[in-house]
């Protein structure tokens, strides 16, 4: 099954999206946006940037866990991954975003 985006609205009227893999696992979480239109632009940015290896910033948290940020051409963070135990599992997460990030399916939960 192909991945999809889920768009949601928080209790303080901000918007965020997540990218889900085909198995339902969240593989990328956006920053908060003040408008739905901005969040939708963020989804469009994931679609255009996720296939490009150079858009992934690989990081290590202070607790030793691994994660990545997907960045736009202007170096702004579009979304961040979960924490991974190993660098290899982080690479698997990046590969999943590359495959699922071009999805045209958006489940609007706003």
From Swiss-Prot:
It comes from the Bacteria. Pfam families: DUF1508 (PF07411). InterPro entries: DUF1508, UPF0339_domain, YegP-like_sf. Keywords: Repeat. Signal peptide: none annotated. Gene3D superfamilies: 2.30.29.80. Transmembrane segments: none annotated. Sequence repeats lie at residues 10-58, 61-109. Disulfide bonds: none annotated. Belongs to the UPF0339 family. Duplicated subfamily. This is UPF0339 protein YegP. It comes from Escherichia coli O6:H1 (strain CFT073 / ATCC 700928 / UPEC). The lineage of its organism: Bacteria, Pseudomonadati, Pseudomonadota, Gammaproteobacteria, Enterobacterales.
């Amino acid at each position: 099954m192909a991945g999809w985006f889920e768009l949601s609205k928080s209790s303080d009227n901000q918007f965020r999206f997540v990218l889900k893999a085909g198995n339902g696992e969240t593989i990328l979480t956006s920053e908060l946006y003040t408008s739905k239109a901005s969040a939708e632009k963020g989804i469009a940015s994931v679609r255009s940037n996720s296939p490009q290896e150079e858009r992934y910033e690989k990081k290590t948290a202070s607790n030793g866990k691994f994660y990545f940020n997907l960045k736009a051409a202007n170096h702004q963070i579009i979304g961040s991954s979960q924490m991974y135990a190993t660098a290899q599992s982080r690479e698997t997460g990046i590969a999943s975003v590359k495959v699922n990030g071009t999805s045209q399916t958006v489940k609007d939960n706003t």
